[in-house]
């Protein structure tokens, strides 16, 4: 009976150590993942800003073209 308790205690001890090592490794992986998420989020923000600027410029040009077309139609110079 003493050897059974001894082997059970050894298994419990080894299981506890392996569990703590797994948790540390998982924590390290999650910390690395946060950096990647921040980089992706930063890249998306930059692309979003560039897209907004491009759309504003495009809308401005389309507005000018539309006004030119309307004034052309009104004055019947087209």
From Swiss-Prot:
It holds the Pfam family Antimicrobial_2. Residues 1-22 form the signal peptide. Keywords: Amphibian defense peptide, Antibiotic, Antimicrobial, Cleavage on pair of basic residues, Disulfide bond, Fungicide, Secreted, Signal. It is found in: Secreted. GO terms for biological process: defense response to fungus; defense response to Gram-negative bacterium; killing of cells of another organism. Expressed by the skin glands. InterPro entries: Antimicrobial_frog_2 (IPR012521), Frog_antimicrobial_propeptide (IPR004275). Its main location: secreted. Residues 23-39 form a propeptide. Disulfide bonds join 72-78. Transmembrane segments: none annotated. One of its GO terms (cellular component) is extracellular region. Belongs to the frog skin active peptide (FSAP) family. Esculentin subfamily. Antimicrobial activity against the Gram-negative bacterium E.coli, the Gram-positive bacterium S.aureus and the yeast C.albicans. This is Esculentin-2PLa.
């Amino acid at each position: 009976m003493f050897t059974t308790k001894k082997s059970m205690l050894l298994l419990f001890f080894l299981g506890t150590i392996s569990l703590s090592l797994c948790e540390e490794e998982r924590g390290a992986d999650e910390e690395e993942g946060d950096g990647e998420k921040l980089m992706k989020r930063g890249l998306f923000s930059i692309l979003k800003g560039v897209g907004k600027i491009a759309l504003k410029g495009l809308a401005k040009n389309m507005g000018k073209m539309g006004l030119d077309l309307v004034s052309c139609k009104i004055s019947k110079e087209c």
